[in-house]
């Protein structure tokens, strides 16, 4: 802070600016209202009415929030999501990370895109620009098909073949056995080696091997 100063004139002594006594308690490190006083007396001891200047030291700078970790973040459905958090710094208050308010609607049980928001304000009420993190909950895990019955299966020509089937489970959708597509070219009238294939995909398009 550089004070602009004052001038003083006297009808008898003329310009007595150099005789002004200035007193100031301004502390630019601390927000507050301060006073600068100006006093002067002429050569004959006549004191001027004290003049004061009010100096307001303010903090109007908004804090800055910095995300930690990935943005966007991707997590497999069903996994545990631990937010990486954020830090917040303020020119006046310093580190105000502990004051961050985090709001999250992440549901790891449901595939989708979610948002985590981070807000903070300093001691003087200056609010940071809200920072957001996008969290994508995805399902990339393949279903698993489990055969029932024997493999390989041996039949006599002319026997009736009833396929034992298979089951299918998915980490996200659960039991998807009913979605299995079975393709078979078995002809029990003709000796040979045949293949029965089982395919399934979950609701998110992940196809079993």
Residue map of PLM features:
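Serine/threonine-rich, repeat-prone extracellular segments and beta-strand-based repeat modules
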Residues: 12-53, 71-73, 92-135, 151, ...
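Flexible, low-complexity linkers/stalks enriched in Thr/Pro that connect modular domains
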Residues: 55-60, 135-140
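Solvent-exposed, low-complexity, repeat-rich "mucin-like" stalks and linkers
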Residues: 1-12, 61-92, 141-172
